[in-house]
Design a protein with these regions (language model features):
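Short amphipathic alpha-helical segments
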Residues: 131-132, 159
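Clamp-loader machinery-focused feature within the broader ASCE/P-loop NTPase space
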Residues: 1-130, 136-139
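Conserved small/polar residues in nucleotide/adenosyl-binding loops
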Residues: 160-167
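Acidic/polar active-site rim loop that often engages polyanionic ligands
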Residues: 79, 158-159
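Structural recognition of the conserved hydrophobic beta-strand(s) that form the central parallel beta-sheet
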Residues: 119-120, 146-151
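Short, well-ordered alpha-helical microsegments
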Residues: 127, 157-158
Length: 167
């Protein structure tokens, strides 16, 4: 991992229980090397949602993730129009219409920020046909679109390829 970055955005500083994740994301922010997709893996309560929220704040905040501005508050309340939290709607996972809607939305310009963030929870519940449709979008998103995928295990995630997302 190297040395921890000295200028950690306030939104990421709250990830003190996950120093490797915090430092990795802070370094990417400071160096301007954000990936187009991230895969956060862990059991419920492991901090995936907190890390996804912190990263989204850094991406849409005009102050680089200060954690206290209106944009950051909107992300925290899940009301920011450019940060899309997507959860499985069906009893057995994502429904096809969710994936179609997401793919259609990706090409639209951001409303308030310079980029859009799509946070998909429990991606291991995607069915193969939905995962395949979404994979092309995740591998080749338009400029200014970042995906954060969350799963309990990488093995169960049909979307995961080492080329598609930074783990």
């Amino acid at each position: 991992m190297g040395n921890a970055p000295t200028d950690v955005p306030a939104a990421l500083a709250g990830l003190s229980d996950q120093p490797r994740v915090r430092d990795f994301l802070a370094r990417a922010m400071v160096e301007g090397r954000l990936s187009h997709a991230y895969l956060f893996v862990g059991a419920p309560g492991s901090g995936k949602h907190e890390a996804a929220e912190a990263l989204a704040k850094c991406i849409v905040c005009p102050n680089g993730g200060d954690g206290s501005c209106d944009e950051c508050r909107r992300v925290a309340h899940k009301t920011h129009p450019d940060v899309h939290w997507i959860f499985p709607e069906g009893a057995s996972g994502y429904v096809v219409e969710q994936v179609r809607s997401l793919i259609a939305d990706v090409s639209l310009a951001p409303v308030r920020a310079k980029a859009k963030v799509y946070i998909l929870d429990r991606v291991e519940t995607l069915r193969e046909s939905s995962a395949n449709a979404l994979l092309k979008t995740i591998e080749e998103p338009p400029d200014g679109v970042i995906f954060v995928l969350m799963a309990r295990t990488a093995d169960a995630c049909l979307l995961y390829t080492s080329d598609a997302a930074d783990e």
